[in-house]
Amino acid sequence: MSGKGKVHGGKGKSSEIAKSSTSHSARAGLQFPVGRVKRYLKRNAQNKIRVGSKAAIYLTAVLEYLTAEVLELAGNAAKDLKVKRITPRHLQLAIRGDEELDNLIKATIAYGGVLPHINKALLLKVEKKKGQK
């Protein structure tokens, strides 16, 4: 006997401070809900396959990163136009302005408008006419 008393406590009160429960998101250092993403993964699986907790954490981290990236670029677009609210137009400008995000997000954004673009061949003709006068 070591004289330390009960080593393995049962259901009785412990002298140690009880640990408060922490969410999966807090443990992973994320803002997006890991538990909800895991639930969606399990629910949408074809053959009710098992989903590991690390898969849900990884997917949540990727979603959070992409969201932060798009919001940062859209915020910069809104700031350039001197407005304080991000609109679908700012999202469109941010996504289409970044080559990698443009390749990733092929969706049409409602009320996003179009990007201003004039073909270079047309610009050269206009400049030549101005030079001749």
From Swiss-Prot:
Q: Name one GO biological process term.
A: nuclear-transcribed mRNA catabolic process, non-stop decay
Region Disordered: start and end of each range?
A: 1-30
Q: Which domain of life is it from?
A: Eukaryota
Location of N6-acetyllysine modifications: K4, K11, K13
The disulfide bridges present are none
Mostly located where? nucleus
Q: Which cellular component, as a GO term, is one annotated location? A: nucleosome
Q: Which InterPro entries match?
A: Histone-fold (IPR009072), Histone_H2A (IPR002119), Histone_H2A/H2B/H3 (IPR007125), Histone_H2A_C (IPR032454), Histone_H2A_CS (IPR032458)
Family recorded in the similarity comment: Belongs to the histone H2A family.
Subunit comment for this entry?
A: The nucleosome is a histone octamer containing two molecules each of H2A, H2B, H3 and H4 assembled in one H3-H4 heterotetramer and two H2A-H2B heterodimers. The octamer wraps approximately 147 bp of DNA. H2A or its variant H2A.Z forms a heterodimer with H2B. H2A.Z associates with the VPS72/SWC2 subunit of the SWR1 chromatin remodeling complex. Also interacts with RBP1/DNA-directed RNA polymerase II largest subunit.
What protein does this entry describe? Histone H2A.Z
Protein's organism? Candida albicans (strain SC5314 / ATCC MYA-2876)
Record lineage: Eukaryota, Fungi, Dikarya, Ascomycota, Saccharomycotina
